Design a protein with these regions (language model features):
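Secreted/periplasmic carbohydrate-active enzymes, especially glycoside hydrolases
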Residues: 1-9, 17-325, 329-335, 387-388, ...
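Substrate-binding/catalytic cleft of secreted carbohydrate-active enzymes
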Residues: 316-434
Length: 434
């Protein structure tokens, strides 16, 4: 109890201190290609499940702790804490220093925590508390998974793949073309040559291309390797809900002559576009038959439920907030579209724009709105199943925060529609009936 009270005081004094959130595709690393293809982390050396032990409660506050040992070899690595299924506001202290704070316990997030770690024993303390923006979560369904499911810590070499954009597009030449942008990170102080590798297989498991390419990256910076490959006249492999065929790729780094840090990737060929109030997949208008749906407690049950919905003619799912990453993997593989939604679900005062009315018109919350929209977008933007984005629920209201959220998302998403379900006839929405 005394430790929790001390930590609560620390939070109050140092709430502005935070570790850097990694706004990027959600991925983890594997030590071998075989483990990457089977999503098996049991042999991944630098991947540690986050298993927190409750150490005290005080009213609505609850504190959890975990100790990890950081080897000397991690001096050459960037360490991230992945938090998911938290369900409320939270703060994290590492070795007695405030590291990060979040009001959004719904959207999974990665945090760069290397600056707070030291060689040897480290104590990570997680404080769960009511969110200061709890009104944004009033209409959000709680995850069916157990709290802290899929939380983990992982280390990535300081010269590695920070992020990627991946697409397979049909050209005017009637061929498919791989467009792969690999964002390489060099966290050392001096220039490094980074060897970036990839392979690409057809949906029928035929190897089409593989290569290792070098990129010189200055110290403390990032650069992008653009891979453009002709995949041949294979329009029969275009992805849609009726033909969920996926190309398979593995990204990796080659270091000291050996491939390391494998990242599995599945890509649906083709493009989703929006015009004249309709969504098109590969130039064909989609007839949307949708249903609200959030993932079940695990992948097995979710697969069963999605197949049951498909058997009833449903081809589009509408979760009320960001889902676990395997949900989108399942939707890509099973052939079902997804309308992605940010974790913005207030239920009251949607029509009241006065002070104390809808939070969507409270300028003090614009940073929180943008954080939630960015967290939603970056982690899943490469999934073919996502055909549209919504900024929040029908009861979210409209105003300054929604205006800024719409403008930001439209600035980065050039093809898929961005919808404000609560725009009420205003300009900050693409016109589409869902």
């Amino acid at each position: 109890m005394r430790k929790l009270a001390i930590f609560t005081i620390l939070v109050a004094l140092c709430g502005s201190i935070s570790a850097q959130r990694a706004l990027r595709s959600e991925f983890t690393l594997y030590d071998t290609r075989e483990d990457a293809l089977t999503a098996n982390h049991s042999q991944t050396v630098n991947h540690i499940p986050f298993v927190a032990k409750s150490t005290g409660t005080l009213g609505a506050l609850e504190m959890f702790e975990m100790e990890i040992n950081v080897p000397a070899s991690w001096n050459d690595y960037n360490t991230y804490l992945h938090l998911e299924n938290i369900r409320t506001g939270y703060d994290v202290a590492i070795n007695g220093t405030m590291a990060l704070s979040s009001e959004d316990g719904t959207t999974p997030a990665d945090y760069f925590i290397s600056p707070q770690l030291k060689q040897g024993a480290n104590k990570i303390v997680l404080l769960l508390r009511p969110s200061s923006c709890a009104e944004l979560d009033e209409g959000t369904q709680k995850s069916k998974a157990e709290r802290f499911t899929n939380c983990y810590i992982f280390a990535q070499h300081r010269t590695g793949i920070y992020d990627f954009d991946a697409a397979i597009v049909a050209g005017d030449d009637k061929k498919l073309h791989l467009e792969l942008d690999l964002i390489a990170d060099n966290s050392f102080n001096f220039e490094e040559t980074i060897s970036l590798g990839y392979d690409i297989y057809t949906p029928e498991n035929k190897l089409v291309d593989y290569a290792v390419r070098e990129l010189i990256v200055p110290g403390r910076s990032r650069d992008t390797l653009k891979v453009r490959v002709d995949l041949g006249a294979e329009l029969r492999y275009l992805w849609s809900a009726t033909k969920p065929q996926l190309y398979r790729s593995t990204l990796y780094i080659k270091r000291n002559g050996k491939p390391v840090e494998y990242i599995p990737l599945y890509i649906g060929a083709g493009k989703t576009t929006f015009a004249d109030g309709k969504i098109y997949r590969n130039g064909t208008a989609i007839t949307i038959k949708s249903a609200p749906y959030n993932a079940a407690k695990d992948r097995i049950d979710t697969r069963k439920e999605i197949l049951a919905l498909k058997s009833k003619g449903i081809n589009t799912l509408k979760p009320d907030s960001p889902q676990p990453i395997w949900f989108y993997e399942l939707c890509d593989k099973l052939g079902v579209y997804v309308v992605e939604r940010a974790a913005i679900n207030p239920t009251q005062h949607s029509d009241n724009r006065a002070v104390g009315g809808t939070p969507s018109n409270n300028p003090q919350l614009v940073g929180e709105y943008l954080d939630r929209v960015k967290g939603m977008y970056y982690r899943t933007r490469n999934y073919s199943c996502i055909i549209a984005y919504t900024l929040g629920s029908e009861k979210a209201g409209n105003g300054y925060c929604m205006y800024k959220a719409y403008q930001w998302l439209k600035s980065v998403e050039k093809n898929r529609p961005v919808i404000c379900l609560s725009a009420d006839g205003e300009w900050n929405t693409d016109q589409l009936s869902l």
